[in-house]
Amino acid sequence: VPRQRFTEDALRILRLYRFAARFGFAIDPPTAQAAQELCAHLDCVSVERIEEELAKLLSAPAPAAYLNEKILSVVLPELSPEALAAAKPVVDACPAGAENLPVRLAALLLSLGEDGIRRTLKRLRCSNALIEEAAVLVREARGCDGSFLFGHDSGHSIARPIAFGNRVPPQR
């Protein structure tokens, strides 16, 4: 049945991952397999619908586990698997909620640089305000130090400024 539903409307694939992220449930393995096998059909879905689901997914409390590499390769072909893997912990470290979408988009798409994030978000038909805010965050984050890649987070790399929207992170 999932195959049939995903074939009827491929956006249901992204909705599946969004709801799983929002409510924290595990996706049934056959359903996940069907979603991955049919994710190429997402090419037929309007970018506005994809952007809306992606924004809601990224606004969930801890979306990283639900950022599926194969599905995102269709939705965000600009993002390499290595960049996605590096971005996942940073995305989860960012504050949740729709109001923090620019921060999470900047964390997810940091590897694209300022121009790349602008092109990608414009392709997804994001608002000009969202594009500008995310691009500025990427520019500022990349200027924090020379090791702007996530994996080198010694507490002083850009992961911290991006994750906390250039605010001082809470003490643990």
Protein language model annotation of sequence segments:
Residues D9, L14-Y17, Y66-K70, V138:
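A residue-level signal for conserved active-site and pocket-lining positions in enzyme catalytic cores
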Residues E69, P81-R172:
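C-terminal subdomains that position terminal phosphate/3'-OH groups for nucleotidyl transfer/ligation
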Residues V1-T31, E37:
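Acidic, glycine- and histidine-enriched catalytic cores of nucleic acid- and nucleotide-handling enzymes
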Residues V1, R5, D43, R49:
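Divalent-cation-assisted or electrostatically stabilized phosphate/pyrophosphate-binding catalytic cores
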Residues V45-P61, E132-E140:
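Charged/polar, low-hydrophobicity segments characteristic of intrinsically disordered regions
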Residues F6, F25, A40-C44, K56-A60, ...:
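Hydrophobic alpha-helical scaffolding
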Residues T31-L38, E53-L54, P63-S73:
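Hydrophobic alpha-helical interaction segments
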Residues Y17-A20, Q36, A55, R118-R125, ...:
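Amphipathic alpha-helical segments within well-ordered protein domains
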